[in-house]
Amino acid sequence: MSLVACECPPGPGLEPEPCSRARSQACMYLEQIRNRVATGTADVTKRDYLVDAATQIHLALERDVSEDYEAAFNHYQNGVDVLLRGVHVDPNKERREAVKLKITKYLRRAEEIFNCHLQRTLGSGASPNTGFSSLRLRPIRTLSSALEQLKGCRVVGIIKKVQVVQDPATGGTFIVKSLPRCHMVSRERLTIIPHGVPYMTKLLRYFVSEDSIFLHLEHVQGGTLWSHLLSQDHFQYSGLNSGSVQEKSQAQLSTRLSLMTPAELTPGHTLRQNRIPMEPPRTSQSLPPALQLQKEADAEPSSRPSAVFSSDPTEAPCGHSHSQVRRAGQSSNPAPTQRLHWVREGADRVLGAYGRGRGRNPPSANRASLGSGRAAWSLREGQVKQWAAEMLLALEALHQQGVLCRDLNPQNLLLDQAGHIQLTYFGQWSEVEPRCSQEAVDCLYSAPEVGGISELTEACDWWSYGSLLYELLTGMALSQSHPSGFQAHTQLQLPEWLSHPAASLLTELLQFEPQRRLGAGGGGTSRLKSHPFFSTIQWSRLMG
């Protein structure tokens, strides 16, 4: 029936029912179309609400890590509102359940932010000096970058638990280290992002995801200090007797199986360390200039001082042989004039020392030697002194900004192309649970109080510092010369030929009680710098 027929007046005896029925059917048809359009719009809305919520949550995560807590709280609130509105009309049951879990998680985090930061700030007016993560470090937050910037980068290698990544734009490489985020944020542990720390690798940027924080770190090309010292060429030019092929192979086996053996730079290779070692051992052709200078000096004695290391005419090379061992506090005989060396133990002895860690039984009081172990290397005290000064400045700056290392060990000491020490990056994040390397604890690199119930102070790092210097100066690990562990009554074993300033420094650093260690307490770092061992160091020049 046409619309024209409907508009014609009804004839005599005819009812208008056909016209009304047609009009009713048309209305029903239009209503069906409207319903279909409305349903399609709702489906689009259901899909869009997840996108809108994800945008808000992403902004909340960025602001959260940047410690802009008020903005983070607002973004979390907006994201939750979007999810609440969308979840009620979402027809997918599984998706609704997943969204409800996310809502609970984001509400919990928003509540933590309010209780830990906003409520305290609004109620009592927190001072900007109440924590290292407040206004004092505000400029460092500009390093926060969008996670999407990492997507175009290519992983070219894996070293321990970090990735070597290549920037496609520049072709340069950098290190990416991921830190897992915990859902419960500590109120006592503030986020501290150190900057301006001398002799420490630089944090270039950082990225935040829902579950992790990714650190974009400078790639120090020189590798670890220990990898250079343990390399075959360094064994030869350090003056160690090469001996027979069998003896040389045994030393190489011990080196390869030791804790400090660096990882091969191969994609997909994973190891257990949680710090950032760099390159495998280098040959003499690729040694840093500082070590090349030392190699030449050993081959042809010269009065010309190294361009990198300070000169001390009275020092004796470390790692010389000894007929007996003096305990800490005893006088020292003059250092021998010829290069003799300890007889190093086999690989089984080295591994046994590393495996024992801190035992409960103290070493024998009548022990008269460090065993039949041979020093891993022989270094001039001036070299160790320079590296020690650089490490000291790095630790001083970290402590000033409120960061403790807790497990400083050989994996954290890198060597740049100029021969200077570079610490791996240390920081602190409120949402990242601090973890201490168990291997560092077992091998006596961590202080005795680490892992206990007492609160840690800067003194724990000065123990680690002393343990590393002990190994650099003597050529033997502290755990190797003290295989039964270190207790309050343990006497520090020192070689007879060690200089008096070096022996004094090690004795004062390796004190079982934290408060008795050199460097602990107020003004401790100044006292450490003033120790006779550093008498030839020009601190202002190192800082420049």
From Swiss-Prot:
Transmembrane segments: none annotated. Pfam families: MIT (PF04212), Pkinase (PF00069). Residues 262-344, 353-372 are annotated as: Disordered. SUPFAM superfamilies: MIT domain (SSF116846), Protein kinase-like (PK-like) (SSF56112). Residues 87-115 form the MIT domain. Residues 145-534 form the Protein kinase domain. It catalyses: L-seryl-[protein] + ATP = O-phospho-L-seryl-[protein] + ADP + H(+); L-threonyl-[protein] + ATP = O-phospho-L-threonyl-[protein] + ADP + H(+). Keywords: ATP-binding, Kinase, Nucleotide-binding, Ribonucleoprotein, Ribosomal protein, Serine/threonine-protein kinase, Transferase. Belongs to the protein kinase superfamily. Ser/Thr protein kinase family. S6 kinase subfamily. This is Ribosomal protein S6 kinase-like 1.
